[in-house]
UniProtKB/Swiss-Prot annotation:
Biological role: Catalyzes the NADP(+)-dependent oxidation of succinate semialdehyde to succinate. It is believed to be the main source of succinate semialdehyde dehydrogenase activity in Mycobacterium.
Record key words, sorted: NADP, Oxidoreductase, Tricarboxylic acid cycle
Family: Belongs to the aldehyde dehydrogenase family.
Origin species: Mycolicibacterium paratuberculosis (strain ATCC BAA-968 / K-10)
Designated name of the protein: Succinate-semialdehyde dehydrogenase [NADP(+)]
Binding-site residues for NADP(+), renumbered to this chain: W134, N135, K158, H159, A160, S161, G210, S211, L233, E363
EC number: 1.2.1.79
PROSITE patterns, per the entry: ALDEHYDE_DEHYDR_CYS (PS00070)
Catalytic site positions: E232, C266
GO biological process, alphabetically ordered: tricarboxylic acid cycle
InterPro entries in the record: Ald_DH/histidinol_DH (IPR016161), Ald_DH_C (IPR016163), Ald_DH_CS_CYS (IPR016160), Ald_DH_N (IPR016162), Aldehyde_DH_dom (IPR015590), ALDH_GabD1-like (IPR044148), GABD/Sad-like (IPR047110)
Length: 472
């Protein structure tokens, strides 16, 4: 895949970039490693917080310009892109305010371990490689960058090849915010370069957000090198609606949850599992609202759904829908790519889906909603868990006992009750099963690339850890 900005609304190649050479990659790694050796000791939390807040200021001041860039590169609506830029600022501010507390020493009961003092100290690991996707060009990377930099790590970003301008902007704005040169660098390289970077002994760890095959590849390399990783992979999130729910509010939120970011979000609701007593009413209302969405130019403020980011992505969801309909599924609306330039696919609703269809088993990365009828809560949970993924989930019910069942029994990294799955700096984010492992954001995210070092300090009168016979 070329490293280029290709406008998905027109298919026009706007700008191409020359990939970094092997020598440039080596120089970037060396620069990052040398910077880390100094940065981890010479900077305080207060200094890093000042730079993080300054970076947030720039993101806010440049939000309109940044939004236009993201819209040009991957097709999200301008209003969505601006919200993303502002969310990035919020992420930097959160860690500027909270990093020192989140990484404070955790005292242990020294007496129980025969010590004068004992505690856990969190220290940065070093150079962290971030392999990031195109769907949230800045926010996905900031979820790593803000906590990593505040913890004392340094980062190298290998971004998706279709968002090079976003990738370069992020490194630039972080440096303009005051972080020393080399703390955060973007390398415009193909995916084939990831192995070489990750195997370099100066690179301590990796984080990846992307497809399952990409995650498997990075995990295999990191495992061979014994390097820690965080993987945030695909999702096929359920959106369950029970009879006690506010139906109109559930439908409204469900539509938003499906078409957010033009349907290209790992945590977008994709499978709508509705109790049989309200199934027909829910589907009718949902279809009506999906039909009313405006598809078109993502720079038009009136547009609800823009193009898919890539031609191959548009073709993939078209095939998933076509194959399902050919096998007996029912198309309630949408279902055909729009004529004309660009990679547009309309909001689509499919019912009567069976287990042998790709719509049932695969992630659908576009504005396509799959509908399922459930006889009771047991069947709803069974359908929700009948996937290899386990990223986010949504359940709508005002019954407290049902809420607890969903919290306890849905196999996912996140359960949102009477709402839609959203990432917040204040909440840990990640999945289970084939949606990955490890966590981003909040305290879990900043500690993900820290050495949790156990510290045991004996009294000056005793060098015997444990005070007598010891068992490892």
């Amino acid at each position: 895949m070329p490293i280029a900005t290709i406008n998905p609304a027109t298919g026009e190649t706007v700008k191409t970039f020359t990939p970094a050479s092997d020598a440039e990659v080596d120089a970037a790694i060396a620069r990052a490693y040398e910077r880390f050796l100094d940065y981890r000791h010479s900077t305080t939390f207060a200094q890093r917080a000042q730079w993080a807040n300054a970076t947030a200021d720039l993101l806010e001041a440049e939000a309109d310009e940044v939004a236009a860039m993201m819209t040009l590169e991957m097709g999200k609506t301008l209003k969505s892109a601006k919200a993303e830029a502002l969310k990035c600022a919020k992420g930097f501010r959160y860690y500027a305010q909270n990093a020192e507390q989140l990484l404070a020493d955790e005292p242990a009961d020294a007496g129980k371990v025969g010590a004068a003092r004992a505690y856990i100290r969190y220290q940065p690991l070093g150079v962290v490689l971030a392999v990031m996707p195109w769907n949230f060009p800045l926010w996905q990377a900031v979820r790593f960058a803000a906590p990593a930099l505040m913890a004392g790590n340094v980062g190298i970003l290998k971004h998706a090849s279709n968002v090079p301008q976003s990738a370069l902007y992020l490194a630039d704005v972080i440096t303009r915010g005051g972080f020393p040169e080399g703390c955060f660098q973007t390398l415009l390289v193909p995916s084939s370069a990831v192995e070489r970077i990750l195997r370099d002994p100066r690179v301590a760890a990796a984080t990846l957000t992307g497809s399952e095959p990409a995650g498997q590849s990075v995990a295999a390399i990191a495992g061979d090198e014994i390097k820690p990783t965080v993987l945030e992979l695909g999702g096929s999130d359920p959106f369950i609606v029970m009879p006690s729910a506010d139906l109109d509010e559930a439908v409204k939120t469900a539509v938003t949850a499906r078409v957010q970011n033009n349907g290209q979000s790992c945590i977008a609701a994709k499978r709508f599992i509705v109790h049989t007593d309200i199934y027909d009413a829910f589907v009718d209302k949902f279809v009506e609202q999906m039909k009313a969405l405006k598809v078109g130019d993502p720079t038009d403020p009136a547009t609800d759904v823009g193009p898919l980011a890539t031609e191959s992505g548009r073709d993939e969801i078209a095939k998933q829908v076509d194959d399902a309909v050919a096998a007996g599924a029912t198309l309630r609306c949408g279902g055909k790519p729009l004529d004309g330039p660009g990679w547009f696919y309309p909001p689509t609703v499919v019912t009567d889906i069976t287990k042998d269809m790709a719509l049932y088993t695969e992630e659908v990365f576009g504005p396509v909603a799959s509908m399922y009828r459930a006889a009771d809560i047991d069947e709803a949970i069974e359908i929700a868990n009948a996937t290899t993924f386990g990223l986010g989930s949504n359940a709508w019910t005002n019954d407290a006992a049902e809420q607890q069942r969903f919290i306890d029994d849905i196999e996912a990294g996140q359960v949102f009750i009477n709402g839609m799955t959203v990432s917040y700096p204040e909440l840990g984010f990640g999945g289970v099963k084939r949606s990955g492992y490890g966590r981003e954001l909040a305290g879990l995210g900043i500690r993900a690339f820290c050495n949790a070092k156990t510290v045991w300090i004996g009294s000056s009168k005793s060098g015997d850890a444990g005070g007598g016979s010891k068992v490892e």
